[in-house]
Amino acid sequence: MKRIIFCLCSVFAANISFGQPATDIYLFDLSIKKDKVSISNPINITNHKGYDNQPSFHPEKTIIYYSSTNDDGRTDIRSYDYKSKQTKSITQTTEKEYSPTVTPDGQYLSCIIQRDNGAQDLGKYPIDGGEPIVLIDNLIVGYHVWADNSHLGLFVLGTPNTFHYYLLPMKKDATLGENIGRSLHRIPGESAISFVNKASEKEWVIKKLQTETMQISNLGTTLNGSEDLSWLPDGKIVMSDGTKLFYLQPDKGQNWNAVEIESGANVLKGVSRLAVSANGKKLAVVVTE
């Protein structure tokens, strides 16, 4: 690999680079109230032909990390500071990087490193620049989420795709489920992570893994045919049906409620991945170009 130039849960198959959709990332202002969620003032933060996807917020800074194709068709990690409106390249390598995520200690960006031989390792780059450190290279990792400093939830590619809970220091791996979706998240305010079970063709189920007890419970069903979700700081779940946004309050029933779109409805086309800032004031939305 070449050195990083400056200063992150994602891959469906070993050859994700083929046929990647042309996507952009819009940043909306987000308002969260007890019984109302609204978005407004969208800004295209990528405005770049090709694949710009998998947004992830820094937990404290006004920075979004995302995956973006370069001129050679390979995917690198970039960042956008929505205060200074500056874009930077984080990696420029001979590999492909996906799913950039700030590690719990705030010192690194963990990501999927896709290699030309078909391997998909989980690695991390120093957040201010440096050489990568490989964390997991014995599994074909598609997506990841940090439960804490030493535990991760993993989407592992296979037949079928499986959900793993991985203890990093001991390299201890437990398989907890099959046929899961790509959307893995730590649940705000809880020692828990969420994932989507896609075993049924009729409906997909949002599930919660309590990491202290290792108990798995159901939170609700997804919107029909949708698997990408994100958590709001107050415990609501937000999803899209492709053109509109909805939210669910798992502790108050199974009804999806419409997110009010105060401005920017025209840019919401082919909506897929979503990301919410830690303070709940910004929403990143991936759309088709």
What would you call each of these model-derived segments?
Residues 19-289:
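Sequence signature of WD/YWTD-type beta-propeller architectures
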Residues 1-21:
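Bacterial Sec-dependent N-terminal signal peptides
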